[in-house]
Amino acid sequence: MTFSILSIFVFGLISSSVALGPAPVLLGKAENFAILSETGVSNVPDSSVNCDIGVSPIGASGVTGFSLTGDSGGSFSTSKQVTGRVYASTYGDPTPASLTTAVFDMENAYKDAQERIDPDFTNLHTGALGGAILVPGLYKFTTGVSITADLVLTGGPTDTYIFQIAGTLSLAAGVKINLVGGLLPANVVWAVADSVTVAATSSFQGILLGKTQVVVNTNASVEGRILAQTAVVLQKATVIVPGVCGA
């Protein structure tokens, strides 16, 4: 009976024409990047990133493992592992100013997401979300969150989720976050105060707003964006921004 009631409730949410969940978190110029980091992006090749990478205030020395080729104009680099461009604060104008704005917007987005009030759910399942089926809303966790089995997020294309996580976030090896009902990765925001680990062969979905380090391990994927206030580490990983890069 519990499953039947849940199924009816979820169906009602998905079929509703009214957007459910909190007001969207605005990324500003940070939305131009698949990966944006303040202290560097390191990579064990080959990884694949289908949009731009940016690092600031650290310079180009903070981008490793991509075999960068500088543009003749000096404002960006390219890599065979990156479909877009790689920008660093030490490159030529207008890159430094553009990155400063993007980082400012990233920090504001994190602050906005973490400071939302009146959560719909607090410490759901004590942070153990493996196997759960969730509905749109604001989720607050005063400790860490672990996902050890597939997680299902339901909703339509205008519905939203915000996860406020005071500790770490970990996705176990081989585990998937599945979005159903037309829910978009761009509308799922994970604001994490501690480190994020996406284990080998797992599949993560959503916008990662990390206060500290984000690690994406071997053959794992992130469909969304990684916006970190310290370092991003890729190990033969894939980062996919759905749709048009920067949009």
UniProtKB/Swiss-Prot annotation:
Keywords recorded for this protein, A-Z: Glycoprotein, Secreted, Signal
Cleavable signal peptide: 1-19
Subcellular location: Secreted
Pfam families given in the database record: Ice_binding
Residues under site feature: Ice-binding: T64, S146, T218
Residues modified by glycosylation: N219
Highest taxon of source: Eukaryota
Cellular component annotations (GO), alphabetically ordered: extracellular region
Functional description taken from the UniProt entry: Binds ice crystals and most probably inhibits their growth in order to prevent cell damage from extracellular ice.
Similarity annotation: Belongs to the ice-binding protein family.
Protein name per its UniProtKB record: Ice-binding protein
